[in-house]
A protein has these predicted regions:
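N-terminal glycine-/serine-/threonine-rich phosphate-binding loop
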Residues: 1-39
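CN hydrolase (nitrilase-like) catalytic-core segments centered on the catalytic cysteine
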Residues: 63-79, 145-228
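Conserved beta-strand and immediately adjacent loop positions that scaffold enzyme active sites
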Residues: 8, 94, 209-210
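Cys-nucleophile CN-hydrolase/nitrilase-fold catalytic domain and related Cys-dependent amidase chemistry
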Residues: 26-100, 169-188
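Beta-strand-turn-beta hairpins that frame and shape the catalytic cleft
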Residues: 2-9, 128-137, 160
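Short glycine/acidic-enriched loop and turn motifs that connect beta-strands
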Residues: 17, 85-87, 197-199
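Short hydrophobic-aromatic micro-motifs
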Residues: 40-41, 135-140, 162-163
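Active-site catalytic loop in hydrolytic enzyme cores
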Residues: 86-156, 170-177, 236-237
Length: 237
């Protein structure tokens, strides 16, 4: 097997307008165009805000077209957070993978927390996305606090662990501790895109502080707390 090429990654925390998918897609597309990265990771529920009653977003929704176009023009792959439809009705909380070919469901959050179980159905298994030979294990927020989720994901054979999150400022240190633990336990770099700015679900303030950590816990890149910031690093095999 040929060696993996370096992978340029951006963890982004774009501005978000509650329930305005079209506006949020434009913000995502602008971020992708500016990022200069092969992989751009966005926070939990980044396309709607952390709005627990947001309608499910179908991967074929035409409002996603500007993000698909931005990925096509930039040669990027984006991981965006959204409420996702379930067959037979209901919603899960998960991740869309978007590239120049379109959008598809990549992962459904396994470990729901807070008020989420009243609104969403938990996913039943781990998810992996492959880009340029890199196998990326996926997670959403509370998943990172469940060692069994990371272990099941790592058992699929992963080269990095990638998560979107929404946290309070007081939980920023917890988020970092979890990222470092997962990296050490499974020998992979960890990327966390964390929501910045106010959103729903009682999050009048969020942590931001998106980051990228090496497998040994070294901080490779880190955002501040403000919307619109990005953290960028090059992962090497």
């Amino acid at each position: 097997m040929p060696p993996r090429l370096p992978l340029t990654v951006v963890a982004a925390q774009p501005p978000c307008t509650a329930l305005d998918v079209a506006a949020n897609v434009r913000a995502h597309a602008d971020t992708v165009r500016r990022a200069g990265a092969r992989l751009v990771v966005f926070p939990e529920l980044s396309l709607t805000g952390y709005e627990l009653d947001a309608p499910a977003l179908d991967p074929a929704d035409p409002r996603l077209a500007p993000l698909v176009e931005a990925c096509a023009d930039s040669g990027a792959l984006a991981l965006a957070g959204a409420p996702l439809p379930l067959e037979g009705g209901g919603r899960s909380l998960g991740v869309l993978v978007v590239d120049g070919a379109g959008a598809r469901i990549a992962y459904r959050k396994m470990c729901l927390g807070g008020a989420e179980p009243a609104h969403f159905t938990a996913g039943t298994g781990p998810g992996v996305v492959e880009v340029d030979g890199w196998r990326l294990g996926l997670a959403v927020c509370r998943d990172m606090g469940a060692p069994e989720q990371a272990a099941r994901t790592a058992s699929l054979g992963i080269d990095a662990y990638v998560a979107g999150a929404v946290d309070t400022p007081d939980d920023a240190a917890v988020q970092e501790e979890r990222a470092r633990r997962i990296g050490r336990d499974h020998g992979v770099p960890v990327v966390v895109a964390s929501f910045a700015g106010p959103t729903g679900g009682g999050y009048d303030r969020t942590a931001g502080r998106s980051g990228i950590w090496a497998a040994d816990g070294t901080v490779l890149a880190r955002c501040g707390s403000g919307p619109g910031e990005t953290a960028r690093a090059v992962l090497v095999a």
